[in-house]
């Protein structure tokens, strides 16, 4: 696989996702970091996004609920370069019916090389990193070259 680069801008597009048992933890984290998050564009799966918006007043672009396709919608945005980082508080102790969607979402975040926090400690490290407020170059798959190679 060949790679190219893209710039994650200073004003980031952040996906916020949480499993049911983790929603309160994500709400608490968003509340703690509300001031910093106001400078960025927020996206979320349906229930999580509506909870964040109603509890914090922050504007959130909400997708469908995760089990109804929201995880896949966020994954599509990642593939299109429209999400710069993801905070995904997932519950490793409880299986969810849409587990394949969850795995696909995490796979796409890895393929497209975006920062991902899956717990509060990592989310704190991300938001407090000097890079959080700066434009950052990341390596991403060179899809055009990939497509050309596949069509040979």
From Swiss-Prot:
The Enzyme Commission number assigned here is 4.2.3.3
The biological processes this protein is annotated with in GO are:
methylglyoxal biosynthetic process
Record-listed substrate binding positions: 19, 23, 45-48, 65-66, 98
Q: Which residues form the active site?
A: 71 (proton donor/acceptor)
Q: Which InterPro entries match?
A: Methylgl_synth, Methylglyoxal_synth_AS, MGS-like_dom, MGS-like_dom_sf
Question: Which Pfam families does the annotation name?
Answer: MGS (PF02142)
CDD domains attached to this UniProt entry: MGS
Q: Which key words are in the record?
A: Lyase
Q: Which domain of life is it from?
A: Bacteria
- The residue ranges of the MGS-like domain are 6-152
This enzyme catalyses: dihydroxyacetone phosphate = methylglyoxal + phosphate
What sort of enzyme, by top EC class, is this?
A: lyase
Which GO cellular component terms, listed alphabetically, does the Swiss-Prot or TrEMBL entry include?
A: cytosol
Q: Does the keyword Lyase apply?
A: yes
What family does this chain come from, according to its entry?
A: Belongs to the methylglyoxal synthase family.
- The protein's role, per its UniProt record: Catalyzes the formation of methylglyoxal from dihydroxyacetone phosphate.
What name does UniProt use for this protein? Methylglyoxal synthase
UniProt organism field: Pectobacterium atrosepticum (strain SCRI 1043 / ATCC BAA-672)
Protein's gene: mgsA
